[in-house]
A protein has these predicted regions:
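Conserved class I S-adenosyl-L-methionine
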Residues: 1-59
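Class I SAM-dependent methyltransferase SAM/SAH-binding core
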Residues: 60-107
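A short acidic, Gly/Pro-enriched loop at the edge of an enzyme's catalytic core
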Residues: 110-120
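A short SAM/SAH-binding and catalytic strip from SAM-dependent methyltransferases
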Residues: 119-134
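A short glycine-rich, Lys/Arg-flanked "PGG" loop and its adjoining helix->strand segment in the class I
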Residues: 137-149
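Conserved beta-strand signature within the Rossmann-like core of class I S-adenosyl-L-methionine
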Residues: 150-158
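Short alpha-helix
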Residues: 169-184, 190
């Protein structure tokens, strides 16, 4: 029997029942005219459709569904059943990404009949700091393994309490970059927002693009 993955910090904050509330928050933002597709637009600017994109920690499917609508071949992975159920209910007839219920720290797409070799793996929405304690190294290794040589790992997460939910601890960029280097990733570029603004050390948020070694 395989070892059970530890509880993510997201699950500790929400009790695993936060899907509907999370979706409602973005629906409210969209209703005010705010752009809620910055992450998808960022990824689309990196690689043209029909590239393969893995949405790691896809939540309610907002990013994966948007990219699928833009012509990308998308797979969404989420461990929170309440979030993934919203994703499945939200998809339209023309937008049906493949959904996988799995923990990122133990992710093995072969077990779900999905081949690797993704062009992009995106982990938005504070996925990295909301991982279970002590799982950053193996999660980054697992995500790197889903990429083709030269594929991109794209992450966006808060760097201080103002940009993180609840009592979620900070994952420093130094720690994250070190783990990425060990996994065979090199930093290509870092921005301060999903809109591509310049990164400033004390602004509290970073969007990072790392590339898997081509060897």
């Amino acid at each position: 029997m395989s070892e059970q993955a530890p509880q993510t910090r997201w699950a500790q904050l929400t009790g695993g029942v936060g899907g509907s509330d999370y979706a409602a928050r973005f629906e409210a933002l969209a209703a005010t005219g705010q752009d809620v597709h910055g992450e998808a637009a960022f990824c689309a600017a990196l690689v043209p459709a029909p590239a393969r994109v893995l949405d790691a920690g896809c939540g309610t499917g907002r990013v994966a569904i948007r990219l699928h609508d833009l012509g990308y071949d998308c797979v969404g992975v989420e461990v929170d059943e309440s979030m993934l159920s919203v994703a499945v209910a939200t998809e339209t007839a023309s937008s049906r990404p493949d959904w996988v219920l799995a923990d990122l720290s133990t992710l093995d797409l072969d077990q779900h009949g999905i081949p690797g070799g993704f062009d992009v793996c995106v982990a938005a929405g504070n996925v990295i700091p909301l991982l279970a304690e002590g799982t950053l190294v193996r999660t980054v290794a697992a995500l790197t393994a889903t990429l083709r040589p030269g594929g991109l790992l794209v992450t966006g997460f808060g760097l201080d309490s103002a940009h993180l939910p609840g009592t979620c601890p900070v994952t420093s960029l130094a720690a994250y970059d070190s783990v990425c280097e060990v996994a065979g990733l090199e930093l290509l570029v870092r921005h301060g927002t999903w809109q591509g603004t310049a990164f400033v050390e004390d602004q509290g948020y970073a969007v990072s693009v790392h590339r898997r070694s081509r060897s």
